């Protein structure tokens, strides 16, 4: 062998190795799954390359994974005839360059995640150190010579050109020198069970080098001769009886042979009725690196002008990086006639279904298809359309079981709402899957379909309110009249609801109407209409006074027919942002500051003519239009309405000061008795004309 070069592990990898070696994990068995998975990936790569250049397979025409337990040396060897690694690959991939998932995996472990998640973070190779204290990797790539990588995980590793070892032709051989307490992993039975449990559905043959003891039977001729010579015992017997009574001598002989462990053909090629739940679960785990079983599965084939088979899985929970836009999707593996092509095809499924895992095997796509030509491929567009249709079918199947659907909705409701926003073609279908709390649903969630069945006679609109939380909206002044008249209102309290509802204008012909925007019209009797007109006339003067005081803060002031108990509320324009949307947009770190100006609707102040505060204010305004207490109370009511209507205050301190002044008035504390710190506080307008000019208006 040539001289060895020594390299130091990159700091994060060193930390990871230290964590793996020094922490006790009960499920160390996952190392085999990870190493077989890596071998499978290497085989995928060489098979893909060979589609356009058959000579790539010359070094080793067969594609396989071999597992060799060695009880004499206490080693476990895994060999694959995959693409192999160059010297640069060895140095970079196995030690000096940390993958992006290294740090995230350590953070996940620290947060109590299971070590079996290691494959999801792209650092599965290092799981070998769960069971081995030394690992030797021999590898041969078509573009380089054969090299040996070796490390006991003590902070460094060596790489040597292999001049004397057995030639691999092409591929990788990994020898694990097992720790003393991990000898179970050289037991045939244990290894077979592990392959069947975790790697049954790998697309390449996985063979185990097994020891067989066979017994050879040799007839004992000498004993037979003695029998024949015995005196007085010569009898006539038939030939069959003679054969049965022949004595045999057994000799034990030990042999070795390859035993194929994963005998199943690809699961998607079998009929769904032939596959049990456990097989689907095992396939899902090997496909997704998840340690939990799936929530639901859809196995189907499409035939006709276009042929493909697919299996789609819905996980039980959302992955940690579900909405990570920088991460390439790898949820659907694309095969062409059983040959793996790629697992990061962005065009095969829309973003909002990025949580669905699965495999698609097409009979029609060309084997040598590239990512560039995929984008233009009409067949792929048809496959995508079918996958979306089948995903939605699967979600409706999950919805038949309330408990399962609650789990699904908790994990993936944001994806469905994103679908409403993005997928105009299936918007109506996705809308049927949405669930909300409402004024009549209690702790249960209700669907739009169920809402429609409960609608009052003559009701033609679906009412909803958006806000920060259920608690924040359930006692909103906007709901007072609706509740009083017996209308059900949906609570849309997820930030993404604002975006989704902007696209979902109606459901089953019923318009969706916001309780917080202009344009809310409720059915009225003739008496109610007459009374409303009278009150409108009676409070016209006060509306004008309030508008004069507030100026540009509001677009108009009108008599409300939506508030029953509260003195007033602030509604937004039908096509502008709601208070909740304004709050969401203000929280956007990279927002366009110019957008806020024209999208933040002008507010309309609606006053409640039957509220005692408003009635008293009307009397004061009629008695003296210039009464300064009217101005102060109007400002206070406006700021309070901002809060109860879901807006934020631009100057909360000034609002606080007004409240404190009110408290002093209520407690009959004279201004002279106030502490000096209150000197800057805006006084109430009725205290003194001179001080009135100090009053600050607040937006």
Swiss-Prot record:
Localization (cell): Cytoplasm
Short sequence motif named TPR repeat-binding, residue ranges: 695-699
Residues reported in the UniProt entry to bind ATP: 34, 38, 80, 85, 93, 99-101, 120-125, 172, 371
Family annotation (Gene3D superfamilies): 3.30.230.80, 3.40.50.11260, Heat shock protein 90, C-terminal domain, Histidine kinase-like ATPase, C-terminal domain
GO annotation, cellular component aspect: apoplast; chloroplast stroma; Golgi apparatus; plant-type cell wall; plant-type vacuole; plastid
Keyword flag Cytoplasm: yes
Bias kind Acidic residues: ranges: 219-228, 673-690
GO MF annotation: an example: ATP hydrolysis activity
A Pfam family per the record: HSP90
Keyword flag Transferase: no
Keywords of this entry: ATP-binding, Chaperone, Cytoplasm, Nucleotide-binding, Phosphoprotein, Stress response
Complex and partners: Homodimer. Interacts with OEP61, OEP64 and OM64.
Entry's free-text remark on domains: The TPR repeat-binding motif mediates interaction with TPR repeat-containing proteins.
HAMAP family with a match to the protein in the record: HSP90
Protein name: Heat shock protein 90-4
